């Protein structure tokens, strides 16, 4: 375990994330430009695909980090049966949900019930599929729909804010089931689908297209919001949310509806819109 990962056990997660949020939304020219220039240089951010390629045109660091892409910079897989990759990034892990457990790394796993904060909500995904996509600081930070779905409920599960970098994934037990997260449940034409937005150290919030910014909060109460009957339908490939700093999205699918794309595996670099899985039709 690296020194940085070891330190995350004792660092004041909330305080650091609150400070990061204040900096991210600062419109002081010197502050926001120093942050933008530092991150661009350190992580090799490519703005050539951005709708706004001028780094000095962004009013805040958060506006830069959640930047939109040019039209056509990402296109969905042409196969109508393809479920789409929800984001740019790298596959952390993917595969079957076996006996209700989701693989994290060698020697590490957690249950779907822990991740979703509800054993009943996890039951339909037993023996189904999962895909965990890590968004690094250089990536496009908007998350899109793998398939058309109607929003049913969201669940805000409080927790820690460990780093979700590769070293932490390998060494922090049940990492994604311990970090704060927003669980989004959708109804689709094949049944339930869940997209889980996992927070991390320095993540200043998750912003959804239906409710705006979800700011990390103190306390340990799970908060559920019911959207049934609201008619919130998000089409395949449509934006659903964005991270106000980098983190991880986990997609859960029920059994028997899709097969994972054969070219994917742990550590595979991926782009929004490529095939994640393909429907089992007929």
From Swiss-Prot:
Catalytic activities: a 1,2-diacyl-sn-glycero-3-phospho-L-serine + H(+) = a 1,2-diacyl-sn-glycero-3-phosphoethanolamine + CO2
Post-translational modification comment from the UniProt entry: Is synthesized initially as an inactive proenzyme. Formation of the active enzyme involves a self-maturation process in which the active site pyruvoyl group is generated from an internal serine residue via an autocatalytic post-translational modification. Two non-identical subunits are generated from the proenzyme in this reaction, and the pyruvate is formed at the N-terminus of the alpha chain, which is derived from the carboxyl end of the proenzyme.
Keywords of this entry: Cell membrane, Decarboxylase, Lipid biosynthesis, Lipid metabolism, Lyase, Membrane, Phospholipid biosynthesis, Phospholipid metabolism, Pyruvate, Zymogen
Pathway(s) where this gene product acts: Phospholipid metabolism; phosphatidylethanolamine biosynthesis; phosphatidylethanolamine from CDP-diacylglycerol: step 2/2
GO CC terms: plasma membrane
Biological process according to GO: phosphatidylethanolamine biosynthetic process
Disulfide bonds: none
Bilayer topology: Peripheral membrane protein
Subcellular location: Cell membrane
Cofactor, how bound (note): Binds 1 pyruvoyl group covalently per subunit.
Enzyme kind, highest EC tier: lyase
Ranges in a coiled coil: none
GO MF annotation, one: phosphatidylserine decarboxylase activity
InterPro entries, alphabetized: PS_Dcarbxylase, PSD-B, PSD_type1_pro
Role summary: Catalyzes the formation of phosphatidylethanolamine (PtdEtn) from phosphatidylserine (PtdSer).
Subunit structure: Heterodimer of a large membrane-associated beta subunit and a small pyruvoyl-containing alpha subunit.
Record-stated family: Belongs to the phosphatidylserine decarboxylase family. PSD-B subfamily. Prokaryotic type I sub-subfamily.
Identification of the protein by name: Phosphatidylserine decarboxylase proenzyme
Taxon lineage: Bacteria, Pseudomonadati, Pseudomonadota, Gammaproteobacteria, Lysobacterales
């Amino acid at each position: 375990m690296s020194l940085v990962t070891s330190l995350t056990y004792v660092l004041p997660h909330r305080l650091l994330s609150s400070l990061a949020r204040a900096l991210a939304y600062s419109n002081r020219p010197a502050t926001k430009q120093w942050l933008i220039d530092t991150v661009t240089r350190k992580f090799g951010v490519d703005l050539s695909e951005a709708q706004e390629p001028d780094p000095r045109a962004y009013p805040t660091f958060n506006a830069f980090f959640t930047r939109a892409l040019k039209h056509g910079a990402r296109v969905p897989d042409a196969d109508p049966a393809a479920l789409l990759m929800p984001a740019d990034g790298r596959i952390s892990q993917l595969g079957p949900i076996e006996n209700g457990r989701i693989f994290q790394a060698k020697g590490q796993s957690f249950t779907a019930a822990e991740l979703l904060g509800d054993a009943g909500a996890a039951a339909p995904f037993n023996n189904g599929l999962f895909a965990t996509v890590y968004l690094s600081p250089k990536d496009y930070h908007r998350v899109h729909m793998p398939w058309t779905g109607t929003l049913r409920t969201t669940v805000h599960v409080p927790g820690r804010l460990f780093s979700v970098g590769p070293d932490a994934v390998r060494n922090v037990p049940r990492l994604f089931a311990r970090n704060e997260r927003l669980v989004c449940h959708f109804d689709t034409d094949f049944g339930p689908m869940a997209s889980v937005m996992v927070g991390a150290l320095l993540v200043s919030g998750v912003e959804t297209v239906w409710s705006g910014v979800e700011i990390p909060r103190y306390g340990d109460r799970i908060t559920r919001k019911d959207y049934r009957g609201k008619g919130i339908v998000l089409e395949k490939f449509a934006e659903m949310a964005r991270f106000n700093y980098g983190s991880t999205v986990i997609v859960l699918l029920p059994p028997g509806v899709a097969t994972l794309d054969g070219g994917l595996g742990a550590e595979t670099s991926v782009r929004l819109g490529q095939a994640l899985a393909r429907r089992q039709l007929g």
